[in-house]
Amino acid sequence: MFDDLPTLTHAEQQVAVEKIQKLMAEGISTGEAIKIVAQQIREDKKAQNQGTH
């Protein structure tokens, strides 16, 4: 499930945790919140990588 998840800095990990916690506070399940945030991270990293090439 996380094989294609890019490596994150500690600060990026903290932001991801905060996003997951916010989604969970809104009533989304833990698994779904992780899935949503992981997809956002993948998309952000992909966009960053495309911008550098």
Swiss-Prot record:
Query: What Pfam families does its record include?
Result: UPF0181
Which InterPro entries does the UniProt record give? Answer: UPF0181
Instruction: Report the SS bond pairs.
Output: none
What does the similarity note say? Answer: Belongs to the UPF0181 family.
Q: What is this protein called?
A: UPF0181 protein VC_A0569
